[in-house]
Amino acid sequence: MGCCGCGGCGGGCGGCSGGCGGGCGGGCGGGGCGGGCGSCTTCRCYRVGCCSSCCPCCRGCCGGCCSTPVICCCRRTCSSCGCGYGKGCCQQKGCCQQKCCCQKQCCC
């Protein structure tokens, strides 16, 4: 039994059997994380721990859901995000529901 579409990962993403089972538990069951992981180029982050174990490109979302594939994502909100420190900066705009951009990068 895989959660968040871990069963659809196959060998492409890896780490589905061990990582996703403990990371998701019952919280991500049902339609909460519909769509699964897919490949790491089309992977979507939903909630923290949902698809991060299957797709390395998704490392936990901050403050809700990420609707677009991102390279990195942290749990900090925009009010506490500092781009100068190099943390929480995504290479794509609109990575989070709450966002603040500086130097053409999205801090989430």
UniProtKB/Swiss-Prot annotation:
Keywords: Keratin, Repeat. One of its GO terms (cellular component) is intermediate filament. Residues 4-84 are annotated as: 12 X 2 AA repeats of CG. It comes from the Eukaryota. Signal peptide: none annotated. The keyword Transport does not apply. Belongs to the KRTAP type 28 family. In the hair cortex, hair keratin intermediate filaments are embedded in an interfilamentous matrix, consisting of hair keratin-associated proteins (KRTAP), which are essential for the formation of a rigid and resistant hair shaft through their extensive disulfide bond cross-linking with abundant cysteine residues of hair keratins. The matrix proteins include the high-sulfur and high-glycine-tyrosine keratins. Human have a similar number of genes as other primates despite the relative hairlessness of humans. This is Small cysteine and glycine repeat-containing protein 8. The lineage of its organism: Eukaryota, Metazoa, Chordata, Craniata, Vertebrata.
